[in-house]
């Protein structure tokens, strides 16, 4: 499995069945510390709130940290609880597994490295909020949320 290079990215919400939906779309957008991460268009006033530093750790997992302007402290993709449809919080950065979607070069499933019997915990979108979605580990469950990582 190809690993993502460390760098600054914008993260666009797509799906495994439609990894390149064309123009437009919604991007992971920070609204402040301890607040849910949103999915917003890549336009003003959101543009500067959609810049993320993605770093691979020694264990092969990644942190996704907000890299925008005027950040008094470090925060990134995090969670208070990992329950179905719980929001992704901009908080103390947690580690995630990035799984490349087959037949793509820059589309990944973002998975929380949590041991749950029979399920994968993945980052998706509900409404305009990033949330944790649960899917069977056997790959069933249909179209899955994925993210196009576009280097800045």
Swiss-Prot record:
Keyword Transmembrane helix assigned: no
Record-linked InterPro entries: Prot_inh_I48_clitocypin
Tagged with keyword Disulfide bond: no
Coiled-coil residue windows: none
Tissue: Expressed in all analyzed tissues, but expression was higher in the pileus and in the lower part of the stipe.
Gene Ontology molecular-function annotations: cysteine-type endopeptidase inhibitor activity
Free-text function comment from the UniProt entry: Binds and inhibits cysteine proteinases. Inhibits most strongly papain and cathepsin L, more weakly bromelain and cathepsin B while it is completely ineffective against cathepsin H.
Self-association state and partner proteins as the record states: Homodimer.
Record-stated family: Belongs to the protease inhibitor I48 family.
Name of the protein in its database record: Clitocypin-2
């Amino acid at each position: 499995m190809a690993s993502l290079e460390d760098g600054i990215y914008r993260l666009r919400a797509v799906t495994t069945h439609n990894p390149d939906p064309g123009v437009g779309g919604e991007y992971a957008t920070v609204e402040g510390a301890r607040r849910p991460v949103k999915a917003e268009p890549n336009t003003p006033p959101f543009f500067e709130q959609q810049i993320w530093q993605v770093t691979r750790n020694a264990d092969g997992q990644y942190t996704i940290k907000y890299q925008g302007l005027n950040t008094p402290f470090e925060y990134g993709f995090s969670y208070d609880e990992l329950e179905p449809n719980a929001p992704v919080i901009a908080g103390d950065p947690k580690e995630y597994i990035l799984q490349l979607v087959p037949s793509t070069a820059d589309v990944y499933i973002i998975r929380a490295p949590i041991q749950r019997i029979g399920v994968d915990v993945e980052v998706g979108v509900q409404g305009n909020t990033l949330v944790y979605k649960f899917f069977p580990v056997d790959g069933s469950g249909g179209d899955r949320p994925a993210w196009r990582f576009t280097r800045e």
